[in-house]
Amino acid sequence: LILIIPVIIMWIPSIVNASMNFDVHDIPITPENNFFIQGFMGMTWFMIPATLVIATVLLTQTEQSQNGILKMLSLPVSTIRLCLAKFIVIILLTILQMLFCIITYYASAIIASQLQNYNFVLNPWFVCTNVLTLYLAAIPMAAVFWMLSVLVKTPIFSIGLGLASIVPSVLIINTKIWFAYPMSYPFYLLMIQYGKAATGIYSSQIDWFPWFPVSILITILALILSCIRFGTLKKR
């Protein structure tokens, strides 16, 4: 439900307000591209990050119930592997949400097309590659949220820090240091796609450097800190 409900919530307004995609105020973008971009704005800015925050905290909380952490650490497996395995679970959950997001987009586009008598459905290759890119960009963010959930054992504080870090992302993508803030990565890529669909609105070129090496560094550092924390738990 945590994976499904946010997706449904985001696409219902897109169906209800589908007619607004024709009123683009002189912006050179087609209604079907506008439908796609507007529908994914809420997902990339808030829902994907918020889902990751809640999923990581819930996953760490399973360790606390019924001495789960003691049972887990008693296994003949290194804490590093345990930590990375749990992070992989987060990634797998994210992949499931991505697949459901694609399905929901097409369902919404078909319904909107019937209501407005206009074809809002985009090419499957275009949709799948773009959505996959958005979710791949969320991996460094997932690593940071996983690190927070491991380091901050109080759930309310961990969730609070995670959700608070989401809000500035829409502003940070317009600064020169956006690449250092992983919570802004998916929204940045969506805006790049917006720039391609509507010439002159936003940059249509991805600044791979220094983004790519920095994103890898952030992911590695976050996972290292998470694994170290897991190691201290075993020593206790």
PLM features: residue spans?
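Helix-loop-helix units of permease transmembrane domains in multi-pass membrane transporters
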Residues: 59-91
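Terminal transmembrane helical anchor/hairpin motif
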Residues: 13-36, 159-236
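Membrane-interfacial segments
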Residues: 20-25, 61-64, 68, 104, ...
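Secretory targeting signals
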Residues: 3-54, 84-151, 197, 201-213
